[in-house]
Amino acid sequence: MDLGLTREQRAVREAFAALFGKQATPQRVRRAESSPSTGFDGLLWRHYAEIGALGIGVPSDCGGADGGLLELALVAEEAGRRLAPIPVAETAAAARLLGRLREKELLGPVLTGSVIVSLATRSGPVSQQMLVDGAIADAVLALDGESVVYVTRPDRLPKTARRNLGGLPLAPWYAPGATTVLAEGGEARTAFDTAVDEVRVLRAALLVGLASAAVGIGSRYAIVREAFGQRIGMYQAVAHPFADAVTALDGAQLLVHKACWAMDSGQDDAAALAAMAFAFAAETSYHATTHSLHVHGGYGFMEEYDIQLYYRRAKAWAAAFADPRRELLTVADRLFGPVTTGGR
């Protein structure tokens, strides 16, 4: 196992760092957050599609670039670093699932960005779920029983998000549109479960990028802010938690990359690693952003300061997928087997 990046992978990371650095400015993030669909920048989405992002993880015979999960994780990390107000994780996993199912006709408009397809990460009818991209998605892939279904958005459903602290286009679909069964049986369920694990890994990558940027914001503030006659970064109570955060984030990033490798190479522990990556990234990003906000003092809670954008999303982006503490039970189940009477 080599977790080092190839030249092509470094180029992917640099390209998307440049895109998000230019197009996902704090001003654009704030503007998207205040829009009715909350957390969606249509112009950024268009540029994201034009650069080929939506086809990175899709097989070449379906019109994609034949990339792996690691390439998508690199994109997600850069998106998280800039709080990019576009759907990254669920849409990427949904596109890969359509590719596995060889749904080339459905994939066409998805790869151009003209149709946004998300993934309902909990099994059951779409009408019973709060969808992370519900305010902007044109269609949703879901698991209903043993069937993978493609559910379209009804025309009468308004594109209005539920208010939330994470700047997410959260919305329920109480009355979904037309439903098409794409696959049925055990293989269909396995394919869908794999897609959900890919969301786990990509959400972890988003959180790693988010927290890395938050640590940078906090440490730069600590260098210039003075108290009691010296810069606060000189105090160990300020500096040491930043060092701990950087170390933990390096570990979280490596765990994300290992999970990507395990899933792409079909390792037996791939599912456990995916859950580990999400749980650890969620915990690490929350602690890192909390310290960065704390260092700002009262200013950290003011909307004029960027750190509050990161602090709010650190918890909300994780919670939108799952409770990180309960995710540890998923890790245990996948490592040791489900809980049974009398223990594991």
What annotation goes with each model-predicted range?
Residues 1-82, 185, 194-344:
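Alpha-helical interface subdomain recognition
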Residues 83-89, 96-216, 220, 342-344:
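FAD-binding core of flavoproteins
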